Amino acid sequence: MAKGISPQLEDKIKRYQSLQQQMSSLQQQIQAVKLEQLDIDKALKEIEDLPDDEECYRSIGRLLVKSNIKETKVKLGEQKDLYNTRVKLAEKSYEKIKKQFEDLENELKAALESGEK
């Protein structure tokens, strides 16, 4: 860091940057999971009116597996629930980190305004 900055202020700045990176990473994770949720919703909409015993294929990793509509709806519903949980947990973590970030930002502003080094 720059000359004349106290080790405490330097630590706060590093923590501030770290929190900023964590927030950015969480935002990206949340966005990615929400996109997955949209894909599941589209798939469920496509098959909603089909008979439960009709055959279909579902993607498992790089494989396509023969299934039926009923089983596929169940699996997609389970995935959707899992993604909903992941989004809620990530958003909760984001809010916690955001609070820490804002508190630290206020501390840094106060330190800079008071001329602390």
Where are these regions (language model features)?
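Amphipathic alpha-helical coiled-coil segments
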Residues: 12, 16-26, 30-33, 37-40, ...
